[in-house]
Amino acid sequence: YLPIMNPNIAVFKPQLEDDIVRAFNQVPKLLSGEDLGKQAEKDYCFVETEDQFQNYREQFENAQKIVVDIETTSVSPHTGTILGIAMSTRPHQGIYVSVDIVNKHKQWFHNLFMDKLCIFHNSKFDTNYMETEMGFEFPNYEDTMLLHYCLEEAVGTHGLKPLALRFTDLGDYERELDEYKKSWARKNKVKLADFNYGMLPSDILAPYACKDADATFQLYGKFKPLVEKSEDFNRLYENILLPATHAMKTLEKNGGPINIEQVNWLAEQYQIDMEECLEEINTHEAVQRFERVYEKTFNPNSTAQLRDLFFSILKLKPTKKTDTGAWSVDKEVLTNLNHPLSEAILELREKTKMAGTYISNIKNGVDKDGRLRSGFNIHGTTSGRLSSSGNLNYQNIPRDNKDIKKLFKARPGYKIIQCDLGTAEVYYAAMLSGDKFLQKAFIDKLDFHSYVAKQMFNLPEEVNQVKKLHPNERQYAKAITF
């Protein structure tokens, strides 16, 4: 029993308080000689024959709720396939059914999932996969990931494995699989990024899948009562999070329409542009002088070399320091230098970023139907805002780059529209606080930041004139508001 966490950390990370208390409660048991590593007896089974399936069939039919968890070869049903379905009807149980048995009894599984309360961890992933590949439907389901998000909104704490480590007796059960994966990848000279669960033998994958199902059932038993105790938490979970995750699943299934011809053209054009930028940089007299003085090839991505080039070779005046005290060569500084070299380097940076972050990701991620599918998360922020991850962050499309925007093209008969919910947080604050001053701006449909600026700076103009006549004051008001 080795202490690895100072209890004072709970002051800065309150979400760890329960873990610390739980650890202290274990100390008397440890001192009394109790075996803290002892696990409850498990009922795990890999169902790969008809006889094995029949042994569990009645148990599933008689259960009121069933944990469902799938193992796949890819994160996307458009590029991967289901290997099997793990299920559980009680804690410490996990039944992993091979995909061959599932396909043989597909109608039975369809009826089962239609009739039972199905419990998932990250339901969006499992239901999307099974709906797409097998046509299953889940009219009644719960999600332990969203239950935990209600109880603890901290980012990065909602994964099944860390939650199982904190709240169940299963420990770090992914370790054996990870060790096998690394060993297999080394032996077969395969990159870990190219490894998929279809490469795992059943004696590794099946126990792992069973533990996924077991962990989910145990977490449901802990989280669901806690959420139900709070009227606010329960309303958030039932009325907002569950419907929202269903809506996000629809977004992910649909994906975004991509103009693949434009993607290919832009990839070639940006490559030409980047080569021209490099040519302009490398042939500049100052860069050649740099290479003679420092006896090395100039690297435009090196902050130290940029500093030497602009402030030692060109003798330009530095304007800003970094947190470490070194002269900065960030975008603002290079822009203010107003030098042909700094302009070329800024263009190279921008083109390189666009090519890597957007063009390459879109080109490599687009599916056969010409649509790009990525993730939308309702548990990815502490504020309750959505986040996007995967092939492309759909919430981070460059606002002013028309080249990138042209990569998205509506299918015939449709339009792509751009909407923005302005000052959303302030709207909620006005509604929840009952502040009449805040509410008036929205009731009268005024520009909120202009409205605040007029009051703050006692401006004589009408609210609708502030944005044009006093842009700086409006920006100050905006900064203070947020």
State the predicted function of each range:
Residues 1-15:
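Short, flexible loop segments at boundaries between secondary-structure elements
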Residues 61-64, 68-93, 99-102, 234, ...:
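Acidic, glycine-rich two-metal-ion catalytic cores of nucleic acid-processing enzymes
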Residues 209, 213, 244-247, 263-281, ...:
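Short amphipathic alpha-helical coiled-coil/interface segments
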Residues 13-70, 78, 105, 109, ...:
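N-terminal accessory regions of nucleic-acid-interacting proteins
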Residues 82, 145, 164, 205, ...:
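Short alpha-helical scaffolding segments that buttress acidic/His motifs in well-ordered protein cores
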Residues 2, 31-48, 76, 80-228, ...:
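Active-site-proximal helix-loop-helix substrate-binding element of RNase H-like nuclease domains
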